[in-house]
Amino acid sequence: MKASMFLALAGLVLLFVVCYASESEEKEFPRELISKIFAVDDFKGEVRECKGFGKSCVPGKNECCSGYACNSRDKWCKVLLGK
């Protein structure tokens, strides 16, 4: 009986701690998001966007994102295998 009461109390305390932590993160989230948006705008002209899976590409131009390669036959980014 004492062990089950202790486990129930410990579970409630753990639930309280998790809820409190997630609530404090939610309050910080808008500020972090805004700061990241403005930081990205500063380097917008310098950063080259890569193309993901299935996007059309030109072989040899290295347009695909990391882990993908432009397939010369189909001319779209595929998963890079074996290298």
From Swiss-Prot:
Expressed by the venom gland. Its main location: secreted. It is found in: Secreted. Disulfide bonds join C50-C65, C57-C70, C64-C77. Changing G54W: Low gain of inhibition activity against hNav1.7/SCN9A (IC(50)=2.7 uM), and gain of binding to anionic POPG liposome. Important gain of inhibition activity (IC(50)=440 nM), and gain of binding to anionic POPG liposome. GO terms for molecular function: ion channel inhibitor activity; sodium channel regulator activity; toxin activity. GO terms for cellular component: extracellular region. Keywords: Amidation, Disulfide bond, Ion channel impairing toxin, Knottin, Neurotoxin, Secreted, Signal, Toxin, Voltage-gated sodium channel impairing toxin. It holds the Pfam family Toxin_12. Changing V79W: No gain of activity against hNav1.7/SCN9A. Belongs to the neurotoxin 10 (Hwtx-1) family. 14 (Hntx-1) subfamily. Monomer. Weakly blocks the rat SCN2A/SCN1B (Nav1.2/beta-1) sodium channel (IC(50)=68 uM) and the insect sodium channel para/tipE (IC(50)=4.3 uM), without altering the activation or inactivation kinetics (depressant toxin). This is Mu-theraphotoxin-Hhn2b 3. It comes from Cyriopagopus hainanus.
